[in-house]
């Protein structure tokens, strides 16, 4: 029996949704532990593309319990829309398997209004927020002003907390040049949401602990990526939650001792959305080629992603921070049309080789990547179903990345569909 965490090993958008979808077959329960609807997991089921922003990818597998933990911030409207869309598509016939932590925090209209207004006034210092209120909601959580799901379904508590928050938030909005928000409409709308959400509410920490005691296999689904972690990422160009494997414990109330395997998801190259340092970024036709061939446009925002060569410094950092036991390598097929492929093996700053990623932003922004060049394979590999059938140069590329990462590659993906995946080792031990 193993409980497995899946984390992004780069700056997000690595293909976690597909990997989680595949691992779900071996898990009993799938748990989302951080972030909000700023994340988008794209899955291809048959010929159908499914994009999920809040609900764990395991929802596409009948009978699997899906849990949204206390570390998540939830936009009720988005959650309800996602549930209804899944039901209409015949993907969620029994929603009793879907649980929400009573302790998760609720995204309010003022969070979104403040998020958008701040970003608009940031000029060239934009973080690249999605404008969905994620950061301001986490601010209220840390500031002990937040509204939790248990508060939302208590009309008296919700009314009091809403009035207190509006007094403060409207003052902020007015300073930002925005119109204040009214109490009545928000109260009525969110009480309607509460009527729908209360059926899903549970003490999910207790539920999950009982599942562990009963020998159930848990799969923890992370959002974003290691380099977007609020503590360990490229601060301040990060998200507002703990995206690393440690967040799986704090974001669910499951003991860290009950986490046995951590799989980091990495593209065979690197992408990033929004601002922030990116040493291997390609601003030429090669970067544009990666973007077009890889379909590198955000599932949540549609924004074009910045693209660059594989960065072993980033992956080694992710291995160390998360305690990765394996790497799932995605989008290897995107590199099939390159004569040669570069891999960043290290950084130089002011002539000195760096041992690890620099914590100081100004240093990171001015790092010079050290590259080695590997031969490409110039063969379409999207139809390959066995690792041994990959072209020799593709296997050499995978082996070199494994050496540089210091961690075994346990899965290779050569396309968006489930069947375009080669599982070298199953973290659930099956």
Swiss-Prot record:
Binds 1 Mg(2+) ion per subunit. InterPro entries: Adenylosuccin_syn_GTP-bd (IPR018220), Adenylosuccin_syn_Lys_AS (IPR033128), Adenylosuccinate_synth_dom1 (IPR042109), Adenylosuccinate_synth_dom2 (IPR042110), Adenylosuccinate_synth_dom3 (IPR042111), Adenylosuccinate_synthetase (IPR001114), P-loop_NTPase (IPR027417). Its cofactor is Mg(2+). IMP binds at residues 13-16, 38-41, 130, 144, 224, 239, 303. This is Adenylosuccinate synthetase. Keywords: Cytoplasm, GTP-binding, Ligase, Magnesium, Metal-binding, Nucleotide-binding, Purine biosynthesis. Substrate binds at residues 299-305.
